[in-house]
Amino acid sequence: MPGMVLFGRRWAIASDDLVFPGFFELVVRVLWWIGILTLYLMHRGKLDCAGGALLSSYLIVLMILLAVVICTVSAIMCVSMRGTICNPGPRKSMSKLLYIRLALFFPEMVWASLGAAWVADGVQCDRTVVNGIIATVVVSWIIIAATVVSIIIVFDPLGGKMAPYSSAGPSHLDSHDSSQLLNGLKTAATSVWETRIKLLCCCIGKDDHTRVAFSSTAELFSTYFSDTDLVPSDIAAGLALLHQQQDNIRNNQEPAQVVCHAPGSSQEADLDAELENCHHYMQFAAAAYGWPLYIYRNPLTGLCRIGGDCCRSRTTDYDLVGGDQLNCHFGSILHTTGLQYRDFIHVSFHDKVYELPFLVALDHRKESVVVAVRGTMSLQDVLTDLSAESEVLDVECEVQDRLAHKGISQAARYVYQRLINDGILSQAFSIAPEYRLVIVGHSLGGGAAALLATMLRAAYPQVRCYAFSPPRGLWSKALQEYSQSFIVSLVLGKDVIPRLSVTNLEDLKRRILRVVAHCNKPKYKILLHGLWYELFGGNPNNLPTELDGGDQEVLTQPLLGEQSLLTRWSPAYSFSSDSPLDSSPKYPPLYPPGRIIHLQEEGASGRFGCCSAAHYSAKWSHEAEFSKILIGPKMLTDHMPDILMRALDSVVSDRAACVSCPAQGVSSVDVA
């Protein structure tokens, strides 16, 4: 950090990123040099054949060339190990070394070509020597090809626009010019991100919704990354440091922060009842994912169980529309929910941007009409997730501030129109008019379910919603408070999605910058220690030491790079640890739905939960407990529906077996 400037443009790699690539190349080159030297010493007496003098010269020059490359790579590696992320001064000679290293590729290419030509001419020498030359040529071209691929990966399309301003500084541009430059860079960045997203989603149909989602997602990414000059390894190092810092804070505060109390019997009974409901309705939320999740959960027997359903002809007992392998999907739904064919009213696997698959079924056990909305499982769903602007939710309620996540709001509106306009709910309640309406979903489906329940509440006042691992950035604070009477959310452990919002991502970015600015260890040590800590654990107190107090001014400065300099010129920018997060009108603070049940793992079950059965406690939690993203190896796995289902199985069975335990689930630990 910042990205290096070479050949007049910025690259998405920093001068301290070359330790590990350099070490890998150094090992390959040294082994290669030893092999060539051994080959030459053992067979130099057998090179008196036709063309042998050329091969002898080839091997000698190759060894000299390899020795020069080894020395250059060693120097690059040593220089890259100097300094810290925020102190690139000791690495100022890196650009010259890289120019030398790149220049050495030309004689390597020439020599590899000559070796290939000589071998192709049919040199009549010892076969071992010829095979050694062939191996040398192959290795040379593999390294050259790998270098070309690496250059493509670290190429920054905006590098040519940003590099000229790295030496100009703010003193060379007035506020008007700097504002124009910033707007120009942001426009270019949005265009680049939109091109990337279109390439990634090249197989998605291009309708109006998709084009809007492309633009919305591109603007989100360009806005988020516009005020820093972070390279990917900086983010990885920051996340590693932040994880250790969070664990250290939790360990130090735990004795003072644990508050044990005996809640009222009504509160505990309510928690037990809602946990049982969550345990029951999670089956429907999982069923909405269809056969992929079912096979994933049952890798050995799943395919055999639903194989017959895949080949079975459809019946007329239910509507089954959209998507492929519909009978496979429906077979997995039957096995997951335990319902019969006649219990399903409508099953849709139609999947487009802002249009989510869903199912409607009659649940006779709970006497409810269940609407289950599928979560993220396709690129179309990802684009729906990333359409993070806010729009006013069109609902009939007394709440004034009705802002909601645009993508999820439109997805919920689509399901609402299908349920009402196509008469799906009317059909369901004509069969079971005494049943109540329950809407469920996981992840994106959980957010859509919460919005859908709010839209339907005017027509169905008794509606209930169970949102499993819903995104935090769903709707306004007023709607969050309004929804607590009919929506329950369930969150497992450090799951990142219920903590994910644009505001929280901005907070995470600032915390990463802050912890990186404090650290006085080189990046390669941070990454090595972080990898060890993630895999095997350790003592989080062994954090890299911090900068002296006199260097605290680093925290009030944007980290290096032209875009950071541009934001520094803006009077609206503040990097102070005490400054509030900026709230853009397009991305205001948004909150999770309803009341929240938090499942937390008790004891240790291995770093990834695979060493022994985990046990969980459950408690009601305030939404503020999910106002920061927590880093850890389970922040992604805790979001998986199969992991959540196992956690629910565990906590429900444990609470049922411990009805006489008054302290069940009453501990609360707040982690800053």
Curated annotation (Swiss-Prot):
Arranged from A to Z, the UniProt key words for this protein are:
Calcium, Cell membrane, Hydrolase, Lipid degradation, Lipid metabolism, Membrane, Metal-binding, Phosphoprotein, Transmembrane, Transmembrane helix
Q: What is its main location?
A: membrane
Q: Name one GO molecular function term.
A: triacylglycerol lipase activity
Cited InterPro entries: AB_hydrolase_fold (IPR029058), DAG_Lipase-Related (IPR052214), Fungal_lipase-type (IPR002921)
Q: Please tell me, according to the UniProt entry, what happens when changing S443A.
A: Loss of activity
Q: How does the record characterize pH dependence?
A: Optimum pH is 7.0.
**Any one GO CC term of the record:** nucleoplasm
Q: What is this protein called?
A: Diacylglycerol lipase-beta
- Source organism: Homo sapiens
Organism phylogeny: Eukaryota, Metazoa, Chordata, Craniata, Vertebrata
What's the name of its gene? DAGLB
